């Protein structure tokens, strides 16, 4: 364990641990670029049930509920939507998010109702690649 994290065992009730985590200084996150922060923040908030912790027109952070991780959305007016599947000479995805689900078909339908797209190209069974409203690929799997 890194020295700066030693002794940071979380004790107390769930509520005490949740409040205490906001005092920590070892946060890390994944940040997605988007032309419209609000649209993408609301999509992931509704998809995963993560509250929007901070939001303004330049960015947002979603509270994942445990630990010290967050999902960030930052406005990028020059954002170029990636293509899926990847194509030479075209904007490539930089990364993607994976979410394990219990009922794959139900979660695909729910994601699409929230604004996701289901592309024709699907590389494997038990996993579905979808595109969020900004075009970022993400996977749902069982």
Predicted regions and their residues:
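A generic local structural motif
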Residues: 17-18, 82-85, 115
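Long, low-complexity, intrinsically disordered polar/charged segments
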Residues: 43-46, 80-101
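N-terminal beta-strand motif that seeds the catalytic metal site of vicinal oxygen chelate
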Residues: 2-42, 94-101, 141
């Amino acid at each position: 364990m890194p020295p700066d994290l030693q002794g940071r065992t979380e004790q107390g009730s769930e509520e005490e641990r949740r409040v205490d985590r906001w005092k920590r200084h070892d946060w890390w996150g994944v940040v997605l670029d988007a032309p419209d922060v609000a649209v993408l923040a609301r999509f992931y908030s509704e998809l995963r049930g993560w509250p929007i912790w901070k939001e303004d027109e330049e960015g947002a952070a979603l509270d994942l509920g445990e630990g010290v991780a967050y999902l960030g959305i930052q406005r990028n007016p020059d954002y170029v939507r990636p293509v899926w599947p990847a194509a030479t000479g075209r904007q490539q995805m930089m990364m993607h998010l994976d979410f394990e689900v219990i009922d794959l078909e139900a979660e695909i339908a729910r994601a699409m109702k929230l604004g996701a797209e289901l592309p024709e190209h699907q590389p494997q069974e038990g996993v579905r690649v979808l595109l969020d409203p900004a075009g970022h690929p993400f996977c749902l799997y069982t």
